[in-house]
């Protein structure tokens, strides 16, 4: 009996900014992000194209500070558009939802800088306006100057404590979304002159270590109540947080083997929380360059590399690492560094190529397209082969697609790769369900988002 093929699920990963993960592509004639990112038609057309390709969701990342670690300044980040300038991702969602019927919209929102009472209202509003197609990518944030700009001082709260606070933050939002309003609170009773039954709208009276929120929630129940919940933390504490709350996990795993280990770790953590192993859907990031032939795709990738801004790539890398490497010689071996601050990123580099010494120049070269994402370059058949290999050998559920150029990279994938995956019975050809949770998951409101 032939084993049923696992379906490949896709999210488009980008930011309301310029050349999200491939620094310098604003110079590439096929990239439209430099002018388009601030235009609503740009986002509406992208959403419609992704829906044509049966993507689960368009995922919009966000940051609230600048990458100012490299050379102790934000200058390189500003010069090379390292996630700067960056617009608010929540505001384009309503327009994109109006122009589409099925695709979901996920956006990053920080538990460090926004109060849970405000967050609950925002996502309920978006869930209403999208008719249940919104998701929240939960982050605790990591850029120090954002902390200063929000008036929280020049030192970030300690990493694990940020997650402790985020756990409590989630409890507040669950109570507001799930328990403040009864399902039949809206009565619209003309005879009694009553629109909403006040006996069915409740305070939550939450008192915790970080938050005291009496309630009630300001919004009537939305189609999903709780939005679909995504998370991207890869630390031990981040995995524990995801195992408690996330329905989807985004990750940057450089190799099939590292992805396999991460998938196992996430699924094991979910089981420890009393959840099924497949309750969380896991989406590694991947950068795809596709053309009609392998040779044409390689040529396209090489041309894209010619537009790269190495200093921009290093500003991004140092921001992630939290340590300034600019004073090193460009040929010094980073792997020999003993500092704890960068070990996670160095481990990722070793996984990519254990025989490489990984100088700053090597890092800049590798990050030229797709930053640290694994790269798949080739014809539709070659790309589909590799995506199938990742799915079958790692037990991941799909991918976060990170283009080199935008929107052309997404357009190429929808036009060339999606039909190949559909021909192989690896991708759906239409949507079922109405809400994002119903389309993408097996539950309407999962037990893990209900804290009864």
Regions found by a protein language model. Give the residues of each.
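N-terminal beta1-alpha1-beta2 module of alpha/beta enzyme domains
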Residues: 1-99, 224-227, 349
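Hydrophobic faces of well-ordered beta-strands that scaffold small-molecule active sites
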Residues: 10-12, 58-60, 105-107, 134-138, ...
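Conserved small/polar residues in nucleotide/adenosyl-binding loops
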Residues: 442-451
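Internal, glycine-rich beta/alpha segment that forms the wall or movable "lid"
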Residues: 6, 115-240, 244-245, 273, ...
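Short, acidic/polar
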Residues: 39-48, 233-241, 380-390
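Substrate-recognition/cap regions that form aromatic- and gly/pro-loop-enriched pockets
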Residues: 346-414
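Conserved, mostly hydrophobic/aromatic
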Residues: 10, 54, 96, 126, ...
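C-terminal helical cap(s) of enzyme catalytic domains, especially alpha/beta-barrels
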Residues: 170, 262-266, 409-422
């Amino acid at each position: 009996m032939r084993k049923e093929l696992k379906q490949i699920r896709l999210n488009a990963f980008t930011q309301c900014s310029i050349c999200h993960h491939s620094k310098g592509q604003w110079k590439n004639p096929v990239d439209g992000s430099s002018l388009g990112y601030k235009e609503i038609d740009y986002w509406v057309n992208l959403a419609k194209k992704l829906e044509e390709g049966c993507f689960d969701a368009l995922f919009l990342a966000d940051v609230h500070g600048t990458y100012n670690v490299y050379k102790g300044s934000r200058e390189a980040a500003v010069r090379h558009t390292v996630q700067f300038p960056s617009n608010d991702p929540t505001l384009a969602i309503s327009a994109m939802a109006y122009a589409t019927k099925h695709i979901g919209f996920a956006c990053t929102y920080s538990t460090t800088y926004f109060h849970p009472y405000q967050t609950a209202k925002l996502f309920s509003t978006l869930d209403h306006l999208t008719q249940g197609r919104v998701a929240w990518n939960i982050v605790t944030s990591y850029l120090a100057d954002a902390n200063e700009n929000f008036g929280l001082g020049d030192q970030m709260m300690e990493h694990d404590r940020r997650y402790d606070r985020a756990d409590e933050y989630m409890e507040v939002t669950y109570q507001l979304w799930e328990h403040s309003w009864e399902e039949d609170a809206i009565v619209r009773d003309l005879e009694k002159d009553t629109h909403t039954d006040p006996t069915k709208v409740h305070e939550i009276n939450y008192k915790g270590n970080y938050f005291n929120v009496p309630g009630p929630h300001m919004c009537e129940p939305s189609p999903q109540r709780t939005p679909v919940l995504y998370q991207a933390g890869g630390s031990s504490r981040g995995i524990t947080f995801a195992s408690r709350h996330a329905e989807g996990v985004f990750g940057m795993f450089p190799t099939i083997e590292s992805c396999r280990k991460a998938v196992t770790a996430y699924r094991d953590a979910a089981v420890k929380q009393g959840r099924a192993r497949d309750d969380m859907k896991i989406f590694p990031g991947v950068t795809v360059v596709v053309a009609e032939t392998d040779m044409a795709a390689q040529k396209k990738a090489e041309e894209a590399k010619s537009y790269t801004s190495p200093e921009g790539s290093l500003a991004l890398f140092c921001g992630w690492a939290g340590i300034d490497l600019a004073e090193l010689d460009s040929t010094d071996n980073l792997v020999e560094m003993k500092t704890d601050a960068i070990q996670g990123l160095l481990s990722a580099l070793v996984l990519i190529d254990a025989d490489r010494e990984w100088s700053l120049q090597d890092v800049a070269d590798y990050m030229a397209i797709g930053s640290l994402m694994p790269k798949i370059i080739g014809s539709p058949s070659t790309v589909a082969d590799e995506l199938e290999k990742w799915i079958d050998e790692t037990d991941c559920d799909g991918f976060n697609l990170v283009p080199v150029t935008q929107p052309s990279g997404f357009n190429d994938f929808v036009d060339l790769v999606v039909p190949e995956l559909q021909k192989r019975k690896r991708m759906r050809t239409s949507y079922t369900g109405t809400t994002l949770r119903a389309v993408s998951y097996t539950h309407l409101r999962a037990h893990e988002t209900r804290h009864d």
